[in-house]
Amino acid sequence: MTEYKLVVVGAGGVGKSALTIQLIQNHFVDEYDPTIEDSYRKQVVIDGETCLLDILDTAGQEEYSAMRDQYMRTGEGFLLVFAVNSAKSFEDIGTYREQIKRVKDAEEVPMVLVGNKCDLTTWNVKNEQAREVAKQYGIPYIETSAKTRMGVDDAFYTLVREIRKDKDNKGRRGRKLNKPNRRFKCKIL
């Protein structure tokens, strides 16, 4: 069974824990209790493959930012979560993305942009803005509501598909690099 290490990142209060708990336990947590770091595991079937999701729910508060590099090193894929009612949380996404790329020392890292709290009537981040940023980053965009469960499975499952795609691409590049080149015989006189 394949294990996927998923990391949920974003500013404080965007609903990272609520999304994770909704996926794992099928219920909505409506009280806000800032997370330092929580880890969850769940066995699921995605596209016919049974896999184990190892999900790290991270601290959004700035005082825990020193811990970020460590979990970014171990994560295979990242949910970049913002709240649709918070323009600031949307602006912070770029910082998280750049930090992930720096820590992973890679231009392309499996990520999914997640606009959470879509059940709210007031949105300060328009759908088009989020889609445009996701397009610039070359990553999928999923709208979710931890409260109604809308898009929750889709967000996590899409991230697993992005990780698989990334592994396939790296495998193909590796095979191309390992092909023997035409060899010429040399004679030393």
Curated annotation (Swiss-Prot):
| EC number annotated for this UniProt entry | 3.6.5.2
Q: Which residues bind GTP?
A: 10-17, 57-61, 116-119
Q: Which residues carry this modification: Cysteine methyl ester?
A: C186
Q: One GO CC term of this entry? A: membrane
Which PROSITE patterns did the record assign?
RAS
- Coiled-coil positions are none
Superkingdom of the organism of origin: Eukaryota
Q: Where in the cell? A: Cell membrane
**Database matches in NCBIfam families:** small_GTP
User: What does the UniProt function comment say about this protein?
Assistant: Ras proteins bind GDP/GTP and possess intrinsic GTPase activity. Plays a role in eye development by regulating cell growth, survival of postmitotic ommatidial cells and differentiation of photoreceptor cells. During larval development, mediates Ptth/tor signaling leading to the production of ecdysone, a hormone required for the initiation of metamorphosis.
What is the protein's name according to its record? Ras-like protein 1
Q: Which organism is it from?
A: Drosophila persimilis (Fruit fly)
